[in-house]
Amino acid sequence: HGLHWNTQVFDVSSGDIRHIGIREEFGIVIAHELLDDIPATIVEYDEFLTPRIVLVDPESGHEKMGEPLSGPELDWLKIWWPATVPLARREIGTTRDHTWIQLVNIFGTGRAIAIDYSHSLDQRSQGLWDAGTLAGYQHGRSVRPVPNGKVNITAHVSLDSCASAAATSRSDLTRTQEFDSDPTRSDFRWLVQDFGSRP
């Protein structure tokens, strides 16, 4: 189990991409179902529509409402996943935005592609995802998302927010495109962003 690199077939380097000196080269970054595994703060609106951080016991999975959300995460929430009704849940996207910014800045010129479970601002504003998207998987089966280190915990990604964050990070953005990867479902999407111009 885990991540393994096959370096016998292709001439590639393995290791931490941040320490490989290719910043000025043209390249392509593909994040396939990566961002949905990045940890995110979970909040739930109380009866006054105040978003409160959901605290979880890592062994039992028991949840309780914590302190109100604040700072950059609250700013993100107001823009990208506004309040609808009490008890609605949200996964805050700031950590995914930050990860995507790091990925699009690996190369000086190139293309960054994210392929992931996602939702749009229009869908979120309509309340279509008010139950949240937090899910847990173990040995290929859906299980309760208990953060005990044994369960793979995922949540859908706000790819539109990631795209906006990357555009703010790099002034040489030349193209952004989002589209469904499967016409039969609207929650598995591609984000493609091009930066700079290839010589």
Task: Please report, for each region that a protein language model flagged, where it lies by residue.
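Conserved acidic residues
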Residues: F26-G27, G110
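A mobile, often basic/glycine-rich helix-loop segment
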Residues: I28-L77, L128-G136
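Long, Lys/Arg- and hydrophobic-enriched amphipathic alpha-helices
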Residues: E73-P199
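SAM cofactor-binding core of SAM-dependent methyltransferases
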Residues: H1-E25, F195
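Conserved protein kinase catalytic core
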Residues: I17, I22, I38-P39, D122
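Short, well-ordered coil/turn elements that cap or connect secondary structure elements
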Residues: G2-H4, E24, L35, F107, ...
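Short His-Asn-centered micro-motif
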Residues: F10, A31-H32, I115
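Short, glycine/acidic-enriched loop or turn micro-motifs at the edges of active sites
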Residues: S14, L35, Y117-H119
